[in-house]
Amino acid sequence: MVTMMREFYAIDQYPFNEDLTRSNFHQFVQNQDLGSAFVMYNEGNEVIGYVILTYIFSFEFGGRIAFLDELFLNEKARGKGYGKLAVDFVKDFAKEQGLKVVMLEIERHNKNALLLYLNKGFKEHYRNLMIYSPQN
């Protein structure tokens, strides 16, 4: 999983600390309240990607919601319908788990992802995404 995460972060030149990522992932999978991680396989049982959902509680949306934190497909798997299958899986999983909404963010340049999510029923939410890091 960490190898795929490194590949995913490299797409947009995000910093990647392998030791920290391993530690965070271990912490994440040990606590089901934080979210869920899924590995994706092709028909030949080869690993082709992963999905990370994180959970929070929202008064605005009336309960527990998911944030689709990461959806990654390796380069060989892109353009073959696996992204559509992954989004369908996330939507079905959210319904089964009683999640109120699934939110996500997309890099501005990633038009393919935007079209995928719009075609799968996601809607643009006209708010600004803001970040504050208390460690800095």
Protein language model features and the residues they cover:
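Active-site acidic-Proline motif in GNAT/NAT acetyltransferases
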Residues: 74-76, 80, 108-109
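Conserved GNAT acetyl-CoA-binding A-motif
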Residues: 87, 94-105
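Conserved active-site tyrosine of GNAT-family acetyltransferases
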Residues: 117, 122
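Conserved beta-strand-loop-alpha-helix junction that forms the acyl-donor binding cleft
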Residues: 100-113, 131-136
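Generic leucine side-chain signal with a strong bias for well-ordered alpha-helical environments
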Residues: 8, 68-73, 99, 104, ...
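Hydrophobic alpha-helical segments typical of transmembrane helices
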Residues: 24-25, 67, 86, 90, ...
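Conserved acetyl-CoA pyrophosphate-binding loop and the N-cap/start of the following alpha-helix
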Residues: 77-89
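Acetyl-CoA-dependent GNAT
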Residues: 3-63, 69, 93, 124-125, ...
